[in-house]
C-alpha cells in the first residue's frame, strides 16, 4: 500500500501502482490540509465573494458571476461540456495513473476540494475502476481539460469505465461495488479537470517502458557485438572516463560485464583495427539516451507532486491566486526530449541490423539465410526496421513547438504536451520492435559463430529468446517472430523489472 502525501510520490512507486496493481491510501496530515482548505472555499461561497473558478464562470467567462444557488449546476455543466475527448482510449495503466496523480495533487491542500472527492478517487484506484479516457482532444493548457473531464464524469456516475476486464457504464461498476456517485460542489469541477495529469500519467508509463527498453538495448547490442566479433577494447573504462559523462561510463561498464567471458569478442588489431560506429560508439550513443532518461525522470517526479490546478488557495484563504500551473510546457519539453532519445536507440540498432545481414560487412551468410538465393532469410526484416526508424523520425518532430489559441484568445498559448506524451509512447513501441529484429538477427548470427562461445549472460538470454522464436532454418512469416519477441520483451522485462546483467541469468 502506497501512502500519498502530495509531496513524495516517486517513479518506483508508480511502477508498483500502475503495473502491479498496488493500492493507495492518503496521509492523514495531508487530508487534514485538504479539509482546512475546503473550509476556505465554503466561506467564500457563503460570503458571496467574487473569486475565479469558485463563484465565476470559466475561461473567457471568468467575468460572469455565478449565483450561490447555481454553483452545483456550474460544476456539472463544466464537466459535461468539457468532456470532448475523441479517439481510442488511453491504456488502463494511464487512466489509473490519472486517478492517482489527481488525488496526489489535491493532497497538497491548496485545491479547495472536499476530502470526499479525494477519497472517491482513491476508491476507484483501489477497486480498479478505471475511467475510459479518449486520447485526443487536449491542448496541454489549461492542462488536460478534455481527458480529465472524462475522468471526472465517472465520479458522477456518468461516462464509461474499464472494470473487471470489460468496458461498462460507470454506474454498473459503482452499483456492483456499493458506491454512490458524488455531486460536485463549488470549485471541485475545476479542481478535477484543470491540470496536467493525462500527459504526466502517459509520460510516466512511457518512461517506465523506455527505461527498461534502454537496458534491453544494451543486452541485445552485446549479442550483436558477439555476432560480428566486435572489438572489446572500445569499451575500456579509461576511454569513457576520459570523456566524463557518467551515463556513458555506466553503459560501457555494463557491456563489459555482459561480455566479460565471451569467446566471440576480439582485441584491437586481431581481426581489424576498429569497428564501425554502430558498435564502437554504443556507450556514447546509448549513454546520451540515458542522459535524456535521467532528465525526463527528474521532471516527471516534480510534476507528479505538483499543484497544477487554478486558482490555488494559500495562507488559510488570505491568498486565492489565479496562476498558470496547469500549463504543460515542462512535460511537453520532457516528452519531446524523450522522443528523440529513444528514437536514436532504434536508429543505431537498425544500423547494427544492417551489419548483421549485409554480406559485404561481415563473413556471415547473406541475410543470415540458410540457403541464400532460394531463401531470403532476414532481408525484409531490415526493411521493416528501416520503416520503423523512419516513422520515428516523423513522430519525433517536437509537438511543443506548436501552439494554437483557444477560448476566444484568452488561452492564447498552449503546450501540446499530451500529443508529445502520446507520440513518445508510440516511438517506444517502435523502438522495441526494431530491437526485436536486431535480437532475432543477433541470435541467428550467434548460431553461426557457435552458441557455446557466447558469454554466460548472452547465452542465457539467447536460450530465453529461442523459447519465443525458433532458429531460421527455412523462410517463414517473420512478422509473427518480431511480434512474439516484442511482446516477450515488454511483458517479461520492460515493465516488470529493470534488465541488468543478473536479470538475464
Curated annotation (Swiss-Prot):
EC code: 4.3.1.3
Molecular functions per Gene Ontology: histidine ammonia-lyase activity
Modified residues annotated as 2,3-didehydroalanine (Ser) in this record: 142
Compartment list: Cytoplasm
Xref: Pfam families: Lyase_aromatic (PF00221)
SUPFAM superfamilies: L-aspartase-like (SSF48557)
Post-translational modification comment from the UniProt entry: Contains an active site 4-methylidene-imidazol-5-one (MIO), which is formed autocatalytically by cyclization and dehydration of residues Ala-Ser-Gly.
Position(s), cross-link 5-imidazolinone (Ala-Gly): 141-143
Keyword terms of this UniProt record: Cytoplasm, Histidine metabolism, Lyase
Pathway given in the UniProt record: Amino-acid degradation; L-histidine degradation into L-glutamate; N-formimidoyl-L-glutamate from L-histidine: step 1/3
PROSITE patterns: PAL_HISTIDASE
Family assignment from sequence similarity: Belongs to the PAL/histidase family.
Protein name: Histidine ammonia-lyase
Source organism per UniProt: Bacillus cereus (strain ATCC 10987 / NRS 248)
Taxonomy of the source species: Bacteria, Bacillati, Bacillota, Bacilli, Bacillales
Amino acid at each position: 500500500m502506497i501512502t500519498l502525501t502530495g509531496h513524495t510520490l516517486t517513479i518506483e512507486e508508480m511502477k508498483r501502482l500502475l503495473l502491479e496493481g498496488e493500492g493507495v491510501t492518503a496521509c492523514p496530515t495531508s487530508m487534514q490540509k485538504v479539509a482546512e482548505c475546503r473550509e476556505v472555499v465554503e466561506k467564500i461561497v457563503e460570503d458571496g465573494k467574487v473569486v475565479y473558478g469558485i463563484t465565476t464562470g470559466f475561461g473567457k467567462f471568468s467575468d460572469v458571476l455565478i449565483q450561490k444557488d447555481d454553483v452545483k449546476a456550474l460544476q456539472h455543466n463544466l464537466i459535461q461540456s468539457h468532456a470532448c475527448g475523441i479517439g481510442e482510449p488511453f491504456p488502463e495503466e494511464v487512466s489509473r495513473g490519472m486517478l492517482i496523480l489527481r488525488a496526489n495533487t489535491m493532497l497538497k491542500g491548496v485545491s479547495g476540494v472536499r476530502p470526499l472527492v479525494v477519497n472517491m478517487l482513491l476508491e476507484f484506484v483501489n477497486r480498479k475502476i478505471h475511467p475510459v479516457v479518449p486520447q485526443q482532444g487536449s491542448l496541454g493548457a489549461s492542462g488536460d481539460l478534455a481527458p480529465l473531464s472524462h475522468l471526472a464524469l465517472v465520479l458522477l456516475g456518468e461516462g464509461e469505465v474499464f472494470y473487471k476486464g470489460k468496458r461498462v457504464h460507470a454506474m454498473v461498476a459503482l452499483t456492483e461495488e456499493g458506491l454512490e456517485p458524488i455531486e460536485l460542489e463549488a470549485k471541485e469541477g475545476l479542481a478535477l479537470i484543470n491540470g496536467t495529469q493525462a500527459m504526466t500519467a502517459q509520460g510516466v508509463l512511457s518512461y517506465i517502458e523506455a527505461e527498461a527498453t534502454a537496458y534491453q538495448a544494451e543486452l541485445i547490442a552485446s549479442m550483436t557485438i558477439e555476432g560480428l566479433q566486435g572489438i572489446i577494447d572500445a569499451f575500456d573504462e579509461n576511454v569513457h572516463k576520459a570523456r566524463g559523462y557518467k551515463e556513458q561510463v555506466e553503459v560501457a561498464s555494463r557491456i563489459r560485464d555482459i561480455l566479460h567471458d565471451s569467446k566471440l569478442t576480439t582485441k584491437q588489431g586481431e581481426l581489424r583495427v576498429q569497428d564501425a560506429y554502430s558498435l564502437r560508439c554504443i556507450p556514447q550513443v546509448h549513454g546520451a539516451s540515458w542522459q535524456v532518461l535521467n532528465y525526463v525522470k527528474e521532471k516527471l517526479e516534480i510534476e507528479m507532486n505538483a499543484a497544477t490546478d487554478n486558482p490555488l488557495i494559500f495562507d488559510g484563504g488570505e491568498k486565492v491566486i489565479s496562476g498558470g500551473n496547469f500549463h504543460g510546457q515542462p512535460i511537453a519539453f520532457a516528452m519531446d526530449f524523450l522522443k528523440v532519445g529513444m528514437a536514436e536507440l532504434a536508429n543505431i540498432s537498425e544500423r547494427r541490423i544492417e551489419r548483421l545481414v549485409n554480406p559485404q560487412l561481415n563473413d556471415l551468410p547473406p541475410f543470415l539465410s540458410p540457403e541464400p538465393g532460394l531463401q531470403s532469410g532476414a532481408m525484409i526484416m531490415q526493411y521493416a526496421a528501416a520503416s520503423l526508424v523512419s516513422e520515428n523520425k516523423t513522430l519525433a518532430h517536437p509537438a511543443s513547438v506548436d501552439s494554437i489559441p483557444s477560448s476566444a484568445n484568452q488561452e492564447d498559448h498552449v503546450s501540446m504536451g499530451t500529443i508529445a506524451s502520446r507520440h513518445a509512447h508510440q516511438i517506444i513501441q517502435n523502438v522495441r520492435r526494431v530491437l526485436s529484429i536486431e535480437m532475432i538477427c543477433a541470435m541467428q548470427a550467434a548460431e553461426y559463430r557457435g552458441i557455446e562461445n557466447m558469454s554466460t549472460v548472452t547465452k542465457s538470454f539467447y536460450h530465453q529468446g529461442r523459447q519465443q522464436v525458433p532458429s531460421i532454418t527455412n523462410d517463414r512469416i517473420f512478422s509473427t517472430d518480431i511480434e512474439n519477441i516484442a511482446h516477450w520483451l515488454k511483458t517479461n522485462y520492460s515493465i516488470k523489472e529493470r534488465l541488468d546483467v543478473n536479470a538475464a541469468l
